[in-house]
Amino acid sequence: MKRTRYLLLLLFFCSGFLFVDCHNKLSANKFKDVELAHVLPADSLPPSDPLRDKMDTLEKYANLVGERLNGTFIIARHDTIWVERAYGYLELFKDPTGYGNVTYNDLAARKREESNKITLSTLFDLASVSKQFTAAAVLKLCADEKLKLTDSLYRFYPDIPYKNVTIKQLLTHTSGIPEYFNFDFGVYDTTMFITNEQLMHVLAVQKFPVIFRRGAQFKYVNTNYAILAAIVAKVSEMPFEEYVRENLWKPAGMKDTRFFTEIVGLYPSEKSKDYPLVEKSLEYVDVTPVEEYAGKVARGHWRNAALAPYDRLNSILGDKGVYSNVEDMVKWTNAFFINAEILPREWVDKAIKCQNILSNGKTPAEMYGYGVRMEEKPEHGKVIFHGGLWDGFHNVWLYRPSDGLQIIFLSNYYNRAHTGRCDQLLDIIDL
């Protein structure tokens, strides 16, 4: 039965029917040196090695995915890379306005620019995949006894109306606090990129009502993680960016990963700088990465391939705002989740356990831990994962605790090119 299914999958892939819908100076503390291993080509593996046939199929799959994927993807187990690919371009169409007027001649011109090609080291906005770093920072403070999961928001921000909401409820999206994406843009100071500090001020002044009683429901809301980033900065007495870099990224050996605020030169200063607008919009800003990151950072694109300008909300961190590449994400997964090098194992286990149990004792259909989602798949076991969508970026990060398998897609073109592909890869690997 498994052999038949294997042949059907291979036939499916081969048929072509694949609608795959610091700017600042680093401190004296050095990044850990981490080298990732690469698996040998399939034809060099012994015929008796069960990985040989799978590698051949994975290679074919990778080539077909590349027909539509604008981005990178990687398949790894522990610190060994099985397959990794980079496809497409940093920018498709330069013009962020006049979306109806872009032509494929423009795209062809961009394709001829060698410096415009995506590589495996290209940095992508992780969007909500960033949340696992915020959760890890919170858990690190808990492990260091500087914070408790039962601490209330009132302890840190007494002027904010959600005073009885706990750290755990923020981590698990059970706080009832409303989504800041939905606030009227007029509540912000729109002469600048909007920061976590400004968001906290807006919450204190506007006193928006809760959308449900804390603990009563699970609703994925980005405000929770933006608040957590502000709390990390306050408790650690360090900028959020610095705390994460020193305590998470350096021990993991993530030398390339940065925050949006570093990419565009907002960190550690210039946060009050006036920025030009796109089409007189309060929301979008006409700004590009600083020279240090030119040619290293992908720009997001909407479904019509038009360039997505930077949003003023980009500089709110915690819920998003991390830029990374596939190999740095493998280093992170190994250091934090697999080897427990960043936090004691007990805290890592808490992060990947379902934690969003409601006050009535019920578990929502969507299981959420600390910064990650989880699902029990009948054929593949428990997988830990998170997606990310933001201003033209579309990402998926998946990790399986039972064998250290990792599947990561990072894309800067929201054409759904890798939707559902993790399940197909798991089918190949588990046959």
Which role fits each region the language model picked out?
Residues A86, K117, D125, S152-F156, ...:
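Conserved beta-strand positions that form and line the central face of beta-propeller blades
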Residues T80, Y99-D106, N164-V383:
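Short, surface-exposed loop or secondary-structure junction motifs
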Residues P47, L51, E67, T122, ...:
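Residue-level signature of the cytosolic catalytic core of signaling kinases
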Residues M1-K32:
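Bacterial Sec-dependent N-terminal signal peptides
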Residues L64-T72, F93-L170, I211-T223, L317-K320, ...:
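Short active-site loop at a secondary-structure junction
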Residues C22-Y89, D95-L107, S236, R245-E246, ...:
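Catalytic loop of the DD-peptidase/beta-lactamase superfamily, centered on the K-T-G motif
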Residues H38-D43, Y89, T150-D159, D184-D189, ...:
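Short linear capping/connector segments at secondary-structure termini
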